[in-house]
Amino acid sequence: MLTLPNERGRFGMFGGKFVPETLMRPLADIERQLYEALADPSFHAEYMHHLYEYSGRPTALTFAKNLTERLGGAKMYFKREDLNHTGAHKINNAIGQALLAKRMGKRKIIAETGAGQHGVAAATVAARFGMECKVFMGEEDVKRQSLNVFRMKLLGAEVIPVTSGNRTLKDATNEAIRYWVEHCDDHFYMIGSVVGPHPYPMMVREFQRIIGEEAREQMLKAEGKLPNTIIACVGGGSNAIGMFHPFLDDDVECIGVEAAGKGVHTTEHAATITKGTKGVIHGSLTYVLQDEHGQIVEPYSISAGLDYPGVGPEHAYLAHIGRVRYESVTDEEAIAALQMTAETEGIIPAIESAHALAKAFQIAPLRSKHETILVCLSGRGDKDVQTVMNYLEGDERK
């Protein structure tokens, strides 16, 4: 399982490269350079140097003592990706891809962003490594995440609002790919999740697996054994695959949590694996939210980082073979979990992470006190305070 994808970029039937002919050469170049870089000890050493010296790794493993006592049942631990520089797991991948771009001689970066965290991470590494950075962001997300938009601009990036479609992450990705098709000779496209054509899903996983590798060591040190259950939120799914991957060959239950929005029985959700069907989106065969004519159905979630109508092809594969269970959590459940975590542990998680927390809170009381649940706290909630405030005042659309 740990050797996938195959040479065609497939995870079982999922993945691959469904792109215009003009992108086949740039993708082949990235793939070749990536394999060379991953086999080069000096590249790995430089990557780890920046993670530790610049981003602040290793991130902590926190025993959620108060929540454990309040909920009863299993002991709960948090892998604290919210403690990274820029406030989320996205920086792990951004540093890796920036170093690859530098290795390829590319000094201009294109990125797409939903919640703004990947955009901030891309802008951050562009500043760090002396690169130009263009960030495509849906106009709706620009409004929802105005703080992150200003952070990107402060960091020297150009933020390009996207006005097509639902004006969210899918549309930002469409525009970023369109721009890359026209400028692939001197631009490097820095995808923020385990989505897109091969080799991106594998590349982003390789730059995020540090999460699970650290957590594995930390849990063994804290408990003397691996966790019984690992839970992470899934939009595109990079924090989840980074968390799950080092445990896939172990007897560890893995649960991915999608955004149920206003309920999976409505049309306002982003539960792609739960409700989607096989299809192609952004160059990859995966599960997609689409109608009977194959048209993309606009997703919805209060979380700007989870309202994506596709999912990483490796997640599609893991769901298909039954290795990972995918469930969903509503806006209401996520916000309640965010409040409970803040009040009980003094940690304000991102709304994305709160989806994973909500599922953990449902499961923990049903488990033995000898079991452990490890939750990936993928990001901090500073960016979401206004959204939560609006929601609690009765208008999440503000």
Curated annotation (Swiss-Prot):
One of its GO terms (molecular function) is tryptophan synthase activity. It is an enzyme of class 4 (lyase). SUPFAM superfamilies: Tryptophan synthase beta subunit-like PLP-dependent enzymes. GO terms for cellular component: cytoplasm. Its EC number is 4.2.1.20. The keyword S-adenosyl-L-methionine does not apply. Pfam families: PALP. Transmembrane segments: none annotated. The modification N6-(pyridoxal phosphate)lysine is found at residue 90. NCBIfam families: trpB (TIGR00263). Tetramer of two alpha and two beta chains. This is Tryptophan synthase beta chain. It comes from Anoxybacillus flavithermus (strain DSM 21510 / WK1). The gene is trpB.
